[in-house]
Each structure stands twice: as structure tokens, then as C-alpha cells.
Amino acid sequence: MNLKILGIDPGSKNCGYAIIERSKGKNILIEAGLIKIKPSTLQYQITELCEGLDLIFKNHSFDEVAIEDIFFAYNPKTVLKLAQFRGALSLKILQIHGDFAEYTPLQVKKAVTGKAKATKEQVAFMVKRLLGLSKDIKPLDITDAIAIALTHAANLRTRV
């Protein structure tokens, strides 16, 4: 059975997304990219994020959706802004798709590299290796989104 998974790495400047398909025990990268969010008012940026997500859902159907949970930040303003983006993103996913999975950055790093304290570069290296890709994927927002999708695929495999 083929399973299509959307992985999302939410951010206030760029939102990485990745679509993988799990088929016959292998993960295949279908598409990956960025929803670019231009500097503007918070309301406009949230609207851009939601419109970008709408386009992804219009062009693809998914069996599963997984997003990264908010990480700790030292700046309270940053945390509040990210929380608003994540809230809008969560609502949009629930409206379009329904339930979704959430993973902390530590869970994603551990699932992909085996180390909860891995660097973004180590995650990117393992994503490339796990998918058998010949080229590096840039920027790291995209590799993070792929890692989130791979984490969810691995989690589903262990639940079955």
C-alpha cells in the first residue's frame, strides 16, 4: 500500500514542506519546497502562509500530515510570532485535511540521525542518504520538512 505524507517545517520567514511516498518499504521524495513569506504585517504573513498551504493541498492529496512543534526560543516575541503562525497552520490543516501528527525537533533529529542533539547539517546529510539523493537539498528548511515526513513514516511503521 502506498502512503503519501506531507511534512511541514513552520517558520515566520520560510515554511519548508516535503511530500514523500512510502511504497514497498521505501520512502520516495515526490516534491519539496518553500512557502516564502515576505516581510510585512503579521496578518499578511499569516495569510501568505495559509494561501501557500492551500496551493499544496490543491495540487496533492495526502494520507498523513506531520508538522514540527515549536522549539524553545529565548526571545518571547519570536515565540509569540511562531505560535501565531503555527496556530494558523494547524487550523488550516484541520480544515482541509483533518488530524495531523506533531514532532519536536529532538524527536525528528533522533529519528533521522539517531542523535537528539544532531546539527541541521547532520540531519541534511542523513536525509540525503536515507532517500538516496545525489544532490544536496537547500535550504535547510526543506531538509527539515523532509526529516519531519521521514520521522512520521518511521513512526507509522512502528505502530503497524
UniProtKB/Swiss-Prot annotation:
Keyword Isomerase: no
Keywords: Cytoplasm, DNA damage, DNA recombination, DNA repair, DNA-binding, Endonuclease, Hydrolase, Magnesium, Metal-binding, Nuclease
Positions bound to Mg(2+) 1: 9, 141
EC assignment: 3.1.21.10
Root EC class: hydrolase
Cellular localisation: Cytoplasm
Pfam families for the chain: RuvC
One MF term in the entry's GO annotations: magnesium ion binding
CDD domains reported in the protein's UniProt record: RuvC (cd16962)
Transmembrane intervals: none
Signal peptide region: none
Family: Belongs to the RuvC family.
Quaternary structure and partners: Homodimer which binds Holliday junction (HJ) DNA. The HJ becomes 2-fold symmetrical on binding to RuvC with unstacked arms; it has a different conformation from HJ DNA in complex with RuvA. In the full resolvosome a probable DNA-RuvA(4)-RuvB(12)-RuvC(2) complex forms which resolves the HJ.
Its job: The RuvA-RuvB-RuvC complex processes Holliday junction (HJ) DNA during genetic recombination and DNA repair. Endonuclease that resolves HJ intermediates. Cleaves cruciform DNA by making single-stranded nicks across the HJ at symmetrical positions within the homologous arms, yielding a 5'-phosphate and a 3'-hydroxyl group; requires a central core of homology in the junction. The consensus cleavage sequence is 5'-(A/T)TT(C/G)-3'. Cleavage occurs on the 3'-side of the TT dinucleotide at the point of strand exchange.
The name this protein goes by in its record: Crossover junction endodeoxyribonuclease RuvC
Organism: Campylobacter jejuni subsp. doylei (strain ATCC BAA-1458 / RM4099 / 269.97)
